[in-house]
């Protein structure tokens, strides 16, 4: 029996320094609720954003993950294509991180883990956070959009699902990202 059928889905969540740390947190919460295994890697900018936007320490945030990797640990399991992972979500994905991914510049674990997802042609969802976009941002996104398995998913608000609170909007966006890596999330309202 293939290994993927005997273990829960394993998803890497990366958090970089763009605004939107709540997206990463909601992904972790939904993964836990779905019975999937989560691995977390956070950049220094992501840690600052978590503290500023959520009022949480990195340790408090990391409690929602099954495994936590230090972003400096370039030799971690998720840095190897032989380690079985079903997909990765970078939520949020800063333009700096996007540029590193687009150029194959794997200077830290988050960037290396994304590089592994691409070389193994696994699903990689990038929740890019910036507005407005510059021509350089768009060029980097266009470059990545052509890579098999990569999905660019700016966290755009949807209104067809009738969100009343910001938490509901964040949940919907996180659930959409999780669906893209094969994890069903409770209370995800699809268009019907």
Identify the residue ranges that each predicted region occupies.
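A cross-family phosphate/adenosyl-ligand binding-site feature
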Residues: 1-125, 130-192
């Amino acid at each position: 029996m293939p290994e993927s059928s005997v273990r829960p889905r394993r998803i890497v969540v990366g958090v970089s320094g763009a605004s939107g740390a709540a997206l990463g947190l909601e992904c972790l919460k939904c993964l836990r609720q779905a019975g999937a295994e989560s691995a977390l890697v956070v950049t220094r900018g992501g840690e600052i954003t978590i503290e500023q936007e959520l009022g949480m320490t990195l340790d408090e945030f990391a409690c929602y993950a099954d495994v936590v990797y230090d972003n400096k640990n370039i030799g971690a399991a998720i840095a190897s294509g032989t380690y079985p992972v079903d997909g990765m979500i970078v939520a949020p994905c800063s333009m700096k991180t996007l540029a590193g991914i687009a150029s194959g510049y794997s200077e830290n674990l988050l960037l290396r883990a994304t590089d592994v997802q691409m070389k193994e042609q696994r699903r990689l969802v990038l929740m890019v956070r910036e507005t407005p976009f510059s021509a350089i941002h768009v060029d980097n996104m266009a470059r990545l959009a052509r890579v098999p398995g990569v999905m660019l998913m700016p966290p755009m608000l949807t209104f067809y699902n009738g969100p009343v609170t910001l938490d509901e909007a964040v949940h919907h966006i996180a659930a959409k990202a999780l669906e893209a890596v094969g994890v069903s999330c409770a209370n995800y309202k699809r268009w019907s």
